[in-house]
Amino acid sequence: MLRRADGIAEAVDADYGGRCVEETLLAEVMLVVEAARHARGRLRRWARPRRVPAPVAFRPVRASVEPVPKGVVGIMAPWNYPVQLALLPAVD
């Protein structure tokens, strides 16, 4: 995304008819890039199974939560910040 940041900013500028390139780079591109870096650094921890307390009625069982991929996700994004509002939910 960083390699294509200038092209993204130009496309958003063309769509809006004069949006500031710096605003697009800071408010959209860099925000998504930083969110992706944050998620990438924590992905192993988030994806590993973890133990959770079992209800008293079911003891002595052990309970755990095992995260699974979501699969295909549809995102409906508003128009005001198209890159950020479309990609941040995918990163989260």
Where in the sequence are the language-model features?
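N-terminal Rossmann-like NAD(P)+-binding subdomain of aldehyde/semialdehyde dehydrogenases
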Residues: 1-64
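Conserved small-residue-rich beta-alpha loop and adjacent elements
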Residues: 53-92
